Amino acid sequence: MAGLPEKEKLLRNFNRCANWEEKYLYIIELGQRLAPLDDAERTPAHRIQGCQSQVWIVMNPGENGVIEMRGDSDAAIVKGLIAVVFALYQQMTAQDIVNFDVRPWFEEMSLTQHLTPSRSQGLEAMIRAIRAKAADLS
């Protein structure tokens, strides 16, 4: 997840955007920072159900129990949303991820109010899947 801002910086950058067009562009730019997944990682086991777009998230325990996350999507805005979620969860252990609620951060960014219902549902599906995978790893 190199290149993603820390939570507080993400929020500051998001709130500096003058309008929602700028915020969408920032989200897409964050998605471009994610390393692409190998074809071998695009398996049903890593696919997130409940997203209209195709979404894959790979989670592995790293150094000191910190969970390493990698993800991709076939849609630019969704890939950006993956990056936003990863930025909020970065440097956390599996138990930290299970205990951490990202939704207040989305509210501070007014994110869910400006997403289509299907994207909001997909975002919730991503969060549920990440927390479930983290619970399995803890």
Curated annotation (Swiss-Prot):
Keywords: Cytoplasm. InterPro entries: Cysteine_desulfuration_SufE, Fe-S_metab-assoc_dom. Homodimer. Interacts with SufS. The active site is at C51. Belongs to the SufE family. Pathway: Cofactor biosynthesis; iron-sulfur cluster biosynthesis. SUPFAM superfamilies: SufE/NifU. One of its GO terms (biological process) is iron-sulfur cluster assembly. It comes from Cronobacter sakazakii (strain ATCC BAA-894). This is Cysteine desulfuration protein SufE. Pfam families: SufE. NCBIfam families: PRK09296.1. It is found in: Cytoplasm. One of its GO terms (cellular component) is cytoplasm. Participates in cysteine desulfuration mediated by SufS. Cysteine desulfuration mobilizes sulfur from L-cysteine to yield L-alanine and constitutes an essential step in sulfur metabolism for biosynthesis of a variety of sulfur-containing biomolecules. Functions as a sulfur acceptor for SufS, by mediating the direct transfer of the sulfur atom from the S-sulfanylcysteine of SufS, an intermediate product of cysteine desulfuration process.
